[in-house]
């Protein structure tokens, strides 16, 4: 369905991310190889929309069993994410519409230095920034390609996270340009950190969870996306950030916090 973004005051972090996104888009415009078309499925169910939530993948993170009890790295992250999508597609209906809801922190760090963007806390990384970005782009393109074999239309949300505030903007712009000639793919290019999608009388909202807590997110979405919220009967909010599952019903919408596929890092352990 149709959806509209309500842009309010942009804080300095959001403004910097949008500036980076504009730079990437201008640099790539007209020169980026476009996606090769994927044959659409023979038959799909028009009344259904399938949402595939992925959050806190932390591609580029290093986790060693000796220190954390679990293992994670760039190669393992890519393999795990692609297996997750393959298994998910086998279990879902062939709906006409689908949403790839990547809810933030796809990448573990946001610059040449492996530190958190805001507080500059050191992070355990197993690769350099360029390789991490390359793998992240390959993963997103791979997920979309798989989804196009099952669903006729795919809407892509690549949410800002607290680990990849700026790079997530570059990812959105890159993927949008890459698929601009593919009418079966749409990309949410909002730079606010809050995202919405409408299917029939259902509104779906997405935010990483680093700026607004789950208990407080309902009014934020309802006010930012007045038309979507006001013209749908059921609303669902999807968040990540805290790496574990929590589902709450509020007076405004159902709020679900999704778990991570990634292992713990040294800080969490």
Question: Predicted segment positions?
Answer:
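Active-site neighborhood of divalent metal-dependent phosphoester/pyrophosphate hydrolases
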Residues: 53-64, 68, 94-132, 153-166, ...
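Alpha-helix termini
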Residues: 85-95, 104, 147-151, 180-183
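Short, motif-level signal for alpha-helix interfacial/capping segments enriched in acidic residues
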Residues: 31-42, 84, 217-228
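Divalent metal-dependent phosphoesterase catalytic cores across multiple superfamilies
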Residues: 65-95, 137-145
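Conserved beta-sheet core of the metallophosphoesterase superfamily
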Residues: 148, 174-193, 198-269
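Alpha/beta-hydrolase fold active-site loops
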Residues: 49, 98, 234
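Acidic, histidine-bearing metal-coordination/catalytic regions of metal-dependent phosphoesterases
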Residues: 1-75, 93-94
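Extended active-site neighborhood of metal-dependent phosphoesterases/phosphodiesterases
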Residues: 34-39, 43, 121-203
């Amino acid at each position: 369905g149709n959806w509209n973004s309500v842009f309010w005051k942009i804080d300095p972090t959001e403004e910097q991310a949008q500036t980076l996104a504009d730079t990437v888009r201008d640099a790539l415009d007209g020169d980026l190889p476009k996606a090769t078309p994927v044959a659409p499925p023979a038959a799909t169910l028009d009344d259904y929309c399938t949402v595939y939530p992925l959050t806190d993948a932390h591609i580029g993170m290093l986790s060693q069993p000796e220190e954390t009890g679990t293992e994670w790295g760039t190669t393992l992250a890519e393999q795990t994410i692609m297996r997750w999508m393959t298994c998910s597609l086998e279990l879902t209906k062939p709906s006409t519409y689908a949403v790839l809801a990547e809810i933030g922190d796809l990448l573990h760090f946001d610059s040449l230095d492996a530190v958190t963007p805001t507080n500059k806390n050191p992070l355990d990384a197993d690769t350099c920034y360029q390789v991490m970005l390359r793998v992240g782009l390959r993963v997103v393109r791979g997920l979309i390609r798989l989804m196009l074999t099952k669903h006729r239309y795919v809407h892509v949300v690549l949410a800002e996270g607290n680990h990849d505030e700026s790079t997530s903007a570059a990812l959105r712009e890159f993927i949008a340009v890459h698929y601009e000639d593919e009418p079966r793919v749409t990309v949410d290019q909002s730079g606010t950190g809050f995202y919405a999608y409408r299917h029939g009388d259902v509104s779906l909202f997405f935010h990483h969870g680093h700026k607004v807590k789950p208990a407080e997110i309902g009014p934020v979405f309802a006010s930012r996306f007045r038309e979507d919220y006001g013209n749908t009967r059921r609303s669902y909010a999807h968040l990540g950030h805290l790496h574990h599952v929590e589902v709450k019903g509020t007076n405004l919408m159902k709020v679900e916090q999704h778990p991570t596929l990634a292992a713990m890092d040294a800080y969490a352990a």
